[in-house]
Amino acid sequence: FWTDYSPHWKPSTRTSSRSRIDQLLIPHFGELPVDMIARSDINRWRDTMTKREGSFNRTIPIMSVMMQYAEKLGYRAKCSNPCRGVSRFKRELPERYLSADEYRRLGRALANHEFANPFVIPALLLLVYTGARASEIATLRWRYVQIPRLALPDSKTGPKTIYLNPQAIEILSGLDRRADDQLVFPALHREGPINLGEHWIRIRRKAALPDVRLHDLRHSFASAAIAKGIPLATIGKLLGHA
């Protein structure tokens, strides 16, 4: 499946799909023969994902394509896709801006949490300061860093330029620049990009921000500052990044 399908996907799609297969599908279905996976198995998996609704909604299409491919190869009966008819979670995504106190709590959590991967904090701060998507930060390579901008050749909406404010420039300038094709924020114990979602679950728990998603952090912190009346420099200080 991967060999045949992934070459036709954008690099960012390959990265996110590989992560979802490895972290969500293989642990749950990896020991089941492909022809034995039933609708009931998909529904049980859905039941385990009630606190990760967005992840389920983004991953079940991958599972569905894999089942269709198994049918094509003759490993499953025709029209037996167990994902067909399984409903996705309905999600309301209201705008969520952090208050000054919440920025302060987040700053304390970042300062007091010990990360094995030294790139966690700068990656999260860059997400906050740029309003970029988590996937854009995670897959950022040094050749895309052209201060005072990020030149992304492959974002969700196509090529994209992100202009950097002083806080974002300071974050990137504090990192050791490596070869152009290297990731700015690599994973620690495996090949590939950092998994910000995995780290964020622990950080938001420590910061007592259980309802704040990475998607909320990526809202332009300039917009958040306008909505809450908090100066940009003040947000940097609250996050411990003066």
Where are these regions (language model features)?
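Short, aromatic/basic-rich helix-turn unit that serves as a nucleic-acid recognition element
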Residues: 1-22
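A Lys/Arg-rich helix-loop hairpin that forms a DNA/phosphate-binding surface
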Residues: 15, 26-47, 77-80, 91-95, ...
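C-terminal flanking helix
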Residues: 22, 64-67, 71
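Short basic/aromatic active-site micro-motif
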Residues: 37, 119-121, 210-229
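Basic, Lys/Arg- and aromatic-enriched nucleic-acid-binding interface segment
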Residues: 53-61, 72-134, 138, 147, ...
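Active-site/catalytic core of tyrosine-dependent DNA strand-transfer enzymes
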Residues: 99-104, 165-210, 221
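Active-site-proximal segment of tyrosine recombinases
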Residues: 136-138, 212-213, 222, 229-241
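Well-ordered beta-strand positions in beta-sheet-rich domains
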Residues: 149, 161-163
